[in-house]
């Protein structure tokens, strides 16, 4: 909401669920407890927004980025709904056994959750940097597109170069373990983002710890450091992976434990030759990755698919025309008050 409000005047905040992390791992029980406690107030806030803003908006098409409120709104009013997210790739595509090896429980749990969250959308657009085959029964209602990138990243492509630092973005790992490992790689400088948070209770880290330069977050500074780095060390989130690949940066991925989507992304990075994945921050493996970074960079230039922005716009326009009849039926009935 805060990000979109900078670009658009009429943005309504719909609150959602959150994930709790403990020592670099998704805390399943803690996540469940936190969301159960927060659910009543979230529901009240969202219902208020529904009556005050959304009903009067009278949309003809609903798009949801893995958000249940928008999905339920569309179902309630008989509106066409298009899912645009990266999670659906887990259920709607086939994945080789090596992608699921050792994490099959997380895979099954994640798949069940995704299936239950947004069933029966009119179409699913999946953002991804890899292209597994779509399951036969889903082919007519599923489209894969490249990562969707913000304008600042697209502009940074023009000035991107290989500098003398490695960009690190890690919010879930232990700061001590990460910094200790990075300092073992003494022949590189690391620009570290994500370790200074507004809500942190411990004393803030100094500006420099050995060969690690601790950065306060700013969008301009982060994009510049990303565009001029040698390589990226990050978790397995799709957003930064997509941005780094677009700028030609190899990635050393340390996915958050118990989050299958991140593990999957890290393993596909390795399969495609765009970088390495590791369950932990391992200094020796990081040294190997950095020695071979030019090999990974060459693979990215050769194999990475184009950005998905323009293709997404074309697909959405096409879907809007296709579902126009359904939208008109809903408009004739009028939006329901509850």
Predicted ranges, named:
Residues 27-61, 68-69, 105:
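Conserved nucleotide-sugar donor-binding subdomain of glycosyltransferases
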Residues 287-338:
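C-terminal amphipathic helix plus adjacent low-complexity
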């Amino acid at each position: 909401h805060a990000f979109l409000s900078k670009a658009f005047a009429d943005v309504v905040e719909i609150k959602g669920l959150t994930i709790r992390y403990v020592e670099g791992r998704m805390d399943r029980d803690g996540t469940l407890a936190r969301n159960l406690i927060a659910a009543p107030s979230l529901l009240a806030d969202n219902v208020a927004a529904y009556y005050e803003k959304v009903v009067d908006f009278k949309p003809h098409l609903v798009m949801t980025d893995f958000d249940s409120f928008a999905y339920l709104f569309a179902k309630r009013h008989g509106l066409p709904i298009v899912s645009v997210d990266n999670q659906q790739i887990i259920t709607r595509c086939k994945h080789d056994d090596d992608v699921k090896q050792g994490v099959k429980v997380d895979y099954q749990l994640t798949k069940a959750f995704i299936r239950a969250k947004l069933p029966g959308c009119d179409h699913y657009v999946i953002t991804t940097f890899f292209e597994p085959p779509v399951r036969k029964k889903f082919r007519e209602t599923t489209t894969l597109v490249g990562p969707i990138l913000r304008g600042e990243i697209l502009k940074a492509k023009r000035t991107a170069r290989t500098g003398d630092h490695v960009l690190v973005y890690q919010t879930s790992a232990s700061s001590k373990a990460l910094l200790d490992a990075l300092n073992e790689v003494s022949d590189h400088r690391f620009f570290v983002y994500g370790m200074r948070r507004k809500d942190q209770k411990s004393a803030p880290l100094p500006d420099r710890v050995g060969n690690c330069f601790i950065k306060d977050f700013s969008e301009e500074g982060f994009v510049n450091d990303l565009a001029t780095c040698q390589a990226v060390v990050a978790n397995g989130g799709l957003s930064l992976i997509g941005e780094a690949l677009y700028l030609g940066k190899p990635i050393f991925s340390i996915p958050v434990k118990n989050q299958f989507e991140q593990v999957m992304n890290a393993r596909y990075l390795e399969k495609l030759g765009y970088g390495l994945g590791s369950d932990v921050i391992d200094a020796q493996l990081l040294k190997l990755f950095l020695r071979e970074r030019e090999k990974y960079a060459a693979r990215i230039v050769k194999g990475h698919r184009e950005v998905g922005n323009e293709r997404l716009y074309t697909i959405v326009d096409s879907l809007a025309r296709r579902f126009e009849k359904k939208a008109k039926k809903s408009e004739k009935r009028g939006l329901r008050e509850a």
